[in-house]
Amino acid sequence: MDTFFSFYVLPALLILLKSVVLIVVLLIFVAYILYADRKIWAAVQLRRGPNVVGPWGTLQAFADLLKFVFKEPVIPSGANKGVFLLAPLVSAVLAISAWAVIPVNQGWAIANVNVGILYVFAISSLEVYGVIMGGWASNSKYPFLGALRSAAQMVSYEVSIGFVIVTVLLTAGSLNLSDIVLSQHDGIGTRLGLPNTFLDWNWLALFPMFIIFFISALAETNRPPFDLVEAESELVAGHMVEYSSTPFLLFFLGEYVAIVLMCALATILFLGGWLPPFDFVPFTWVPGVIWFVLKVCFVFFGISMVKAFVPRYRYDQLMRLGWKVFLPISLFMVVATAAFLKITGFA
């Protein structure tokens, strides 16, 4: 009985506890990321933004949560009720489950698997099904058009993200997310005789791929200027037109969790994960998880500024950018990186 408890029950309870802690912390973080997004956008437009609920409006996201939860969900009479209600749940659950392999510090991951980056890539690819299910089940032309756009857009930019992952794999020699972070500790700067700093991280050595990943992440998560899936001027709200109350909240939650996930991936692949920007005191005194969160916030700030300053692309411009610009550049970078590592022996 003791053996059964130690080998089966206790590990399962630990995983459950880690999952609950992760979900609670993630949801609170997403609430404040949403608050920051609204504040940044307001500052650019010379507005105040949320400033009523709580000190300086810091509890606005929680007030919105209560508002959505206590509203009555309205289901269109012609909708497929089962798929209509399942779609937002699929979107939210898939977005959260991708975080199982994200290391926010050394050894801080629910599952430290050797193919972690492929797991995240697969989960992010599946998220489009929630959008397609919601658009089809609504039995309305605007949600359906939004769902079709989503399918084409996500498939187009996943190709570029895939080549970015291949490039990072070549430099790190591993698909394990923790190994990818640790490989940036002694990067190109250190090998050239420079001090161990943020110049060792992949953002410098793979700068074109960093830019491609950043822009592709915007398209993958339907963020401006690539928010054509839910373009207000054309499709009202895209696949979420017919949704209200908790189902709408789940779609909204899944969208922002996916955005923060892409910020975390950019941090892990290009910004050194939990590594400090300078490998000496007092920077090494700061816990790695603090550096990780600060880097995620830095990437998200860039995403928010793009939303505030860049106008929305036309759909043909979006597809042309993905297939005629990013695909050739990313493919060339894969070949160039492989050739460089082979010739110089840096791998």
Curated annotation (Swiss-Prot):
Family per similarity comment: Belongs to the complex I subunit 1 family.
GO MF annotation, one: quinone binding
Compartments reported by the entry: Cell inner membrane
Enzyme nomenclature, EC number: 7.1.1.-
Biological role: NDH-1 shuttles electrons from NADH, via FMN and iron-sulfur (Fe-S) centers, to quinones in the respiratory chain. The immediate electron acceptor for the enzyme in this species is believed to be ubiquinone. Couples the redox reaction to proton translocation (for every two electrons transferred, four hydrogen ions are translocated across the cytoplasmic membrane), and thus conserves the redox energy in a proton gradient. This subunit may bind ubiquinone.
One BP annotation, GO: aerobic respiration
Keyword Glycoprotein: no
Protein keywords: Cell inner membrane, Cell membrane, Membrane, NAD, Quinone, Translocase, Transmembrane, Transmembrane helix, Ubiquinone
Subunit and partners: NDH-1 is composed of 14 different subunits. Subunits NuoA, H, J, K, L, M, N constitute the membrane sector of the complex.
Signal peptide (residue range): none
Entries under PANTHER family matching the protein: NADH DEHYDROGENASE SUBUNIT 1, NADH-UBIQUINONE OXIDOREDUCTASE CHAIN 1
Membrane association type: Multi-pass membrane protein
Gene Ontology cellular component terms for the protein in this record: plasma membrane
UniProt xrefs under NCBIfam families: PRK06076.1-2, PRK06076.1-6
Highest taxon above the source species: Bacteria
Protein name as it appears in the record: NADH-quinone oxidoreductase subunit H
Transmembrane segments: 13-33, 82-102, 115-135, 161-181, 198-218, 248-268, 283-303, 321-341
Catalytic activity: a quinone + NADH + 5 H(+)(in) = a quinol + NAD(+) + 4 H(+)(out)
